[in-house]
Every structure is written in C-alpha cells, then in structure tokens.
Amino acid sequence: MRPPGLMPSAWACDGHGPVAPLRTWTKVGPDLLALQAGRVDVPLWCPLPLLPGWTVTGLAVAGDERAGGRATALALSGPSPLGGPADLVLVAEELGTGLGGRTAGTMALDPGVSVSTAPDAKVQAAGHPTPLWLVDSAEDRVAVAGEAGGVWLWAVLWPPAAVLLLLEHVELHDLRHETHAGMTLPVGAPTSRL
C-alpha cells in the first residue's frame, strides 16, 4: 500500500491500483455513528429493530475527506439460530471499492452477482424488497450480495450457518436518514471482523 503523494494523489495498491483508505472503529456510540453517517455518500445499513441479543460491535468507512465515504461496514454480533455466537457485517459500497470482497475473504472488487437464478435471501432495505445471492467467500463465513440504494449491499456472516438469520424478516435502515439521528444502539465487545 502506497500513501498519496504529488503523483499519484490517491492511496494505491500494487495489485488493485487506486484504493480508498479504510478507517475502522471498535467503540461505536451514537456520536460516532451520527458523525460518520453525515460524511458518507453510501448507505450505512443497520437491521432495525435489532434481533434479540444483537449488538453493534464495529464500524468501518472507506474513503477520504476529498472523495467522501465510498463504502461503509457495520459489524454486529449476537446469538446464531443454531446456537453459539454469530457475527454479521453489512457493507454498502460503490462499484469497484472492494470492501465487501475483503470482508468476504476474497480479492474481488465487486460481487459478480448472477441474477439468472432465484435469490438465495431477501431483505427489506429502506423499505424496498432486496434480493441477495450467494457470492464467493472464505470457508469460515458466508456472503450474499445484491443492489440496494444504487450501490452494492453485502451481508457477510460467521459461521456459515448464521445465514439462517436472513430467513427472518430483516429490515435494513439507512442510519444517514434524519429519523435515526441520535439513536442509541446497544454496543457489544469490539469485533475482529473488520
């Protein structure tokens, strides 16, 4: 990873070219959520109401002050439907950003979703039915992706059986919306997933 300089003026990766710098936070409170929600150009998705026992465990934003936030990731933890703990990271990103692929454990910049088959899961995103398809991921997790709000939406879950959470009626809300200003969400132990 090379920092910006006079030429080029963007962060750069030898394998991917220009990339958006990534900032992560493991202590997420209402002030931080409100501040970052006001700085990003893509949705900051959160399932509301939270599933019973679920907490917010981290936040990541890819982008800089000049270009704005090109991707967001909100990490949550709670009980898995089959017992034990589970983690969920919701990523919203512009085309070619790569945060979703990184979270899924692949080198993919975009999910490469094939919509020629029936979706593997469905959620409500900002009140709109949103189909999601299984995409490539590392073996220790499962990832689904689709389009919501004009950008990619990824849901990455650990362990893979936690994908059963998406069989529930999941409503994703964009925390950038003014109705969510000042909302206090339960905060859990910091995540290692970001």
Question: What residues fall within each predicted segment?
Answer:
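Short, solvent-exposed recognition patches
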Residues: T55-L134
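A short, solvent-exposed beta-edge/loop patch
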Residues: S116-L194
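Short, solvent-exposed coil/turn segments at beta-strand boundaries
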Residues: L51-G53, S80-G83, E147-W152
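Proline-anchored loop/turn motifs at beta-strand termini and strand-loop-strand connectors
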Residues: C46-V56
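N-terminal, charge-rich interaction modules
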Residues: R39-V40, W54
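N-terminal cysteine/histidine-rich coordination modules
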Residues: M1-G38
